[in-house]
Amino acid sequence: MLVLTRSVGQAVILSVAGLKIRVALITDSSGALALGIDAPRSVSIRREELPP
C-alpha cells in the first residue's frame, strides 16, 4: 500500500486505463475531514464496506 501525506485542499491524481481520477482531502462545515473524488461517470465509487 502506498501511503501519501496530504494537507487539506491538496489532492492526488490516479490514472487508470486512461481515465483520470482526482482524490482531494477536504473539510465539511463541522470541520471533519472527508475525501472528495472527481471521476468520470463510468467509474464506480463506493465505500469498501458496501457490496459491489
Model-derived features: where do they sit?
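Compact, glycine-rich, soluble single-domain proteins
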Residues: 1-52
